[in-house]
């Protein structure tokens, strides 16, 4: 099967936004116009093509990012629809990692909301070029210009409007194209009939003013155009388009478009913009990786290079079993062939290759560089693994995922379902790296951990629906951590003599606190073989074992740097076991001397409330040990930003609803760990 679309006519894009900005609806419309769906699905009727899990249809929110392939004007567009709820941030991270460009959808009324900020920051991290679509221009309170200024102030974005809306709210009827300087008026509800016409008289002056701003912004990104512009020469549409494309791909500019996906206005122009301004796989830098010998290497987007791909999502499909979604960075792959999972160093056979279209699938025999597809038959592959040609092994940079911050104990409603629940939880943990399952050694309970209350609710819901396991859930537990606050120097000699061969291990270590989030670091500074090489690893393992349970309240220890600088050994009695024990005991000693403290997760909370309830909301946040960061007015409501410990936020949605008669909304997202006040730490330690 030959390649249908050349690489330069391929686009891998994501649609990202805050919950309820209309992201899934926008994707639906793109699929409708590109001929992939014959009937438009409405999210609020629970009939959307992209939201295909039961819970998504019920809640009207997207949980898993479905990957879909569509074609438009001789181009192939692979679209990944990402969830907008903060508990599913990992889905967004995963999809951004394998995308080349993205459409950020903003609500014309809400503007830049917390999850939009968060997703935008993630896209910055991965260097993903973005265009913006200001959606819902037809709703009450829609304000295109306000959204553009919010993008500039809140996201630090070089937002450049490419269009202006004609009318707003109920009277939103069309769009002014600032490049062509004409207007598009929509004649029907499906947005298929549109008429290109002159700009309305009363908007000509405004359009000319914004056109000037557009040309100036574009000229600033290109020296040649700047010279022409300063000399008063007219810049052609083609020159502007080339410069906008270049600046967008370099993440120096974000072209902004507007419309209403629900009323089918402005969507085709966004699809055109995807082709015009977002990169093809050939426009982005080669992906870096590590070869078997530890050398750095690159893989270019080309069918001629050795095969390399990244698995970015694992799903359990009711019909075909385990599906691994992957992005091909280089080379080609045929179904039935063997690949090397370089991350796990295991050979895997690709049974079948499927190209997904929301919840229908098409079987294909070969994939090429730049493609996104799903493979059946990969047993050992998990999210973030590299798949490659066995003859040319390479490990591509993998993804980093945040640690879970909330845990609950879960037990099946009957003993008989215990094993079934274990298997189901294991499958769900394979799909989602931010969801973990472990057994509490002391109580024997099964503990599940995730990124928020909604995240775990959905997991429990899926257990019942997909695996028919009914489970009872305990009260949520916060993932506290421990660390030390001052550097210490300790030594420990582990020595046992009880007839026959004894045990002997002696270490001297320095333990120092690291910056929050820096994790654990171990360095070996011993000289002259005071601790033989083969015993250095066991010392490290012993320390890491001791870190699993701190001394304040038995929580894991984080953010410490350990330096092994001296020690001694015995020719006969020393063993790996002895040095592991010495490392473990030395670290426990260091915790006692290093002024150990308890840390708790703080969330960034944003509450949007009518003015009348402002005092109540702030008083309540203060009573939850919240730190108010600031307030601002936004489209007729007050927005309060605060950092609040997660332990104080359980049940907040119910309390907020009752204190504001259901008129306030809030979002929260994990931000950082901070020291727990002594009085609270004492209660936690006693309660555990």
UniProtKB/Swiss-Prot annotation:
GO terms for cellular component: cytoplasm. It is found in: Cytoplasm. CDD domains: EF-G (cd01886), EFG_III (cd16262), EFG_mtEFG1_IV (cd01434), EFG_mtEFG_C (cd03713), EFG_mtEFG_II (cd04088). Gene3D superfamilies: 3.30.230.10, 3.30.70.240, Elongation Factor G (Translational Gtpase), domain 3, P-loop containing nucleotide triphosphate hydrolases, Translation factors. Keywords: Cytoplasm, Elongation factor, GTP-binding, Nucleotide-binding, Protein biosynthesis. One of its GO terms (molecular function) is translation elongation factor activity. Its main location: cytoplasm. GTP binds at residues 17-24, 81-85, 135-138. GO terms for biological process: ribosome disassembly. Residues 8-282 form the tr-type G domain. Catalyzes the GTP-dependent ribosomal translocation step during translation elongation. During this step, the ribosome changes from the pre-translocational (PRE) to the post-translocational (POST) state as the newly formed A-site-bound peptidyl-tRNA and P-site-bound deacylated tRNA move to the P and E sites, respectively. Catalyzes the coordinated movement of the two tRNA molecules, the mRNA and conformational changes in the ribosome. Belongs to the TRAFAC class translation factor GTPase superfamily. Classic translation factor GTPase family. EF-G/EF-2 subfamily. PANTHER family: RIBOSOME-RELEASING FACTOR 2, MITOCHONDRIAL (PTHR43261:SF1), TRANSLATION ELONGATION FACTOR G-RELATED (PTHR43261). HAMAP family: EF_G_EF_2_B (MF_00054_B). This is Elongation factor G. It comes from Clostridioides difficile (strain 630) (Peptoclostridium difficile).
